[in-house]
Every structure is written in structure tokens, then in C-alpha cells.
């Protein structure tokens, strides 16, 4: 706590290997043992005891495992030798297994897509925090929203959410290209990058790092603090003999031009983290059920007795003759085992998966109504999705806020350089604007917009709120409305006299 931020950063720069230290992802525990010896003891309601420091052990889950869990063609059930097989006797009296294809189900991908849609399905909501904005401020606000939409920043954030929910973390870099245009770039584990963030004891970011390997096998570290971009490599060392940089060399240290680290990072659980075991159970039961259905699904013809191998066919029917002495031969069709219990068990697992992951799988067969469905019915049906998305809005707010701050700062530099607004840096710095996610759910746009009109007519919301909340406004809608009011307020020209 006593060390200053710069002292800690300098220590990282002197020992680059420390930048590679990363807290692992975990899931569950390998033991049931409780380290707190007082657990389960009796005590008085007003008693006190010395606090026990946390020592909870967790099981590490690698990001490579996340990647395999996301890919249905890499699931464990495909390599499970405990799935039963069908054994038959061949013509030569030997036995062999019938080839049976195992099935990996893409639950993880479905959960990922539904959670990403629930959080990112709507455009970001922008709010200008100024009770009486000037015309210049309105113009700058409209310009910011237009450039945000034109450069597809919503889509970039959606991809960032999808990557974090797939592999555990993601990095979004805001930078200025050679033409002085503000651009964005995504770093993900799937593309060969490790995202590592170092913070001080108060949780304030110190260094945001990207660790990767190039095509020649040389490892690199790109580290960003509030001022500089540091590039390290473990290639040909240029360090002196007295340098203790752990084999890493500082290639460059450049001023990145932003007021804070331009790398926006987010870390968290993958979308299916709480239900992975249930998904594996569902896959095992499903594959066992498929084997049973393939072997016995169409029933069995059971023949008892000594049957003459030469069968007769009369009027399209095959006649089997029992040649046994006691004449107790019989033929009957054995019905296949009823699948109802297995199907009910699979459905119960599916219900637990939906509850555990916080999203709902609704298929067309589940919709029984042929008319319009009320908004309340939709909310009740998709309550799991709405609750998860509402929680995700809070969890992702810092990510969106930093992304907006960096984009606004970069856009101001771009507008100054291309001459569109020479005062953009000062004006954009004074513009107090925020952005946030708005959870998505199916709804009737006409009814929603009509509700906004009704609220505006009743004086319960302002015109500005209606512009921001409705689904058809353009980014510069306030400017358009202001221009329209100005034109309507202009006095009409005097009519020309014919006299």
C-alpha cells in the first residue's frame, strides 16, 4: 500500500517476466475439506472470535478447455468409451460391434449466443448530461453518435462480449492509424493472445498487457499504462550483462496519446460455466438413449421352438413351421422399451441447464398462442434472460464507459486533424456523455413507440427523452428537429402585389 503507482510500474518494466503473471480461471473444488476449524461448532449469538483468513482452494480450468467445451466436435462424450455399443453375430459365427456415431451437442454455443443477444441486441443508449445544451454541444453530440455508429462500435462491443463469454477474457484496443483516424482492434485467446491486467492494491489499473507469439516463434509483450506503450521481446537481446530483465528486451516505449491506457479489458466466467457438468450429463444420457433406440427402437421378432429353415410364403405372408416334438413353438413381436422415462429425465436436465445458465430456450412448438402475446407474458417467459442481462449491464458498465471515453478522445483528434472541427479536443473534453447497454427482448416496436408518444402528450417525459428512447430516431435527430422548428418559425414572405 505504501508503494506509489509509478514505483510498481517501474518494477514491472525492470522485470518483464512479472507481467506474465495471471490469475487462473477456476471452477469448483477437488475437496470438501473446510480450512476454518470453527466451522460447525456451537457458539453464543453475541460471541466473538478471531477472524480466519480465507484459504479456499479451487480447481484451475484452462482457457484451452473453454475452447474445447465451446466446440461440440471436441466434447468429452465423443471420446467416452463407457457409452454402450451394439454387438451382433456375423455369418461366420463371430461377433462385432456395429459402428455408432456419438453426438456432441452445442449447448455452449446456444447459451453464448442467447446471452450475447440479450445484452447487446439493442444499440447503446447515449445520454448527454447537460440540462441546457448549446447548439455546438448538440452538434458535437450528434457527431459522436454518428461516428460511433458509422465505425460499428456497437458491433465491436458485441464481438468483445461474445469473446469474453467464450474464453474468459478479452481486450479492445483503441488507437490512431497512420491517417489519424480512430480505430478499434480486438484481442482474444482464439487468435493467439493472452490478456493480462495488473492493478494496485485499490484495484486501480497499472498496466494492461497483451502477450503473444509471432510467426517466427518470438514472444512479445505490449504493455500500456496511462502514458506509454511499451514493447518487449524475448528475441535477440540488446540488454547489458548487468541487466536483470529475465531475457526480455525493451524494444520501444512510445507515447500513445491518450489520457489513460488505450487497452480496454474484461474478465469473467464463460457463459456456460455453472452448467458444464449438467451439459455433459445430458450428452451422456442422450447418447445412451440413442444407442438403445437404434438397437431396440423398432422392436424384436421373438421365435420359440424348432423352426423349419425353409419357410413358405402364402398370400404375401411367411409361414414358419414348428418341427419340435412337444409342439410348443411360438412367435411374438416384442415391443421396444418405452422411452417416456428417458425423455422426462432429459427434459428435467434441460430445465436445470436453463435455470443454471440463466437463459431460456423457446422453440416454435412451445408457443401455443396464435394471436399477439402480451409484454407481461414475454417478460415472465424470458425472466431468466432478462435477469441475467440486467446483471450483465452492471458488470459491463466500466468496459463501455472506458470504451466511450477513449473513442471520444480519439475522435476529437481525428476531427482536428481532418479540419472538420479545429476546436474538437476542447469541446469534446467538456462534453459530458455516457453510454450503457440496454437489455434486449422481443417486443412490438409500434406499441412501444406509441407508448412514448402517449407519455410525451401527458407531459410525463420530455421530447429529448422520446428522441433518445424511440426506435426510429437517427443519431442527429435533435439537430433535425431543431432545424425544422427554426424553419417553421421563420416569417412568411410578403405577397407580391399585381398593382
Which ranges hold each PLM region?
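Short amphipathic alpha-helical segments
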Residues: 136, 140, 148-157, 164, ...
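Extended, regular secondary-structure scaffolds
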Residues: 158-265
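C-terminal helix-loop subdomains that flank or include functional centers
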Residues: 320-326, 341, 348, 352-499
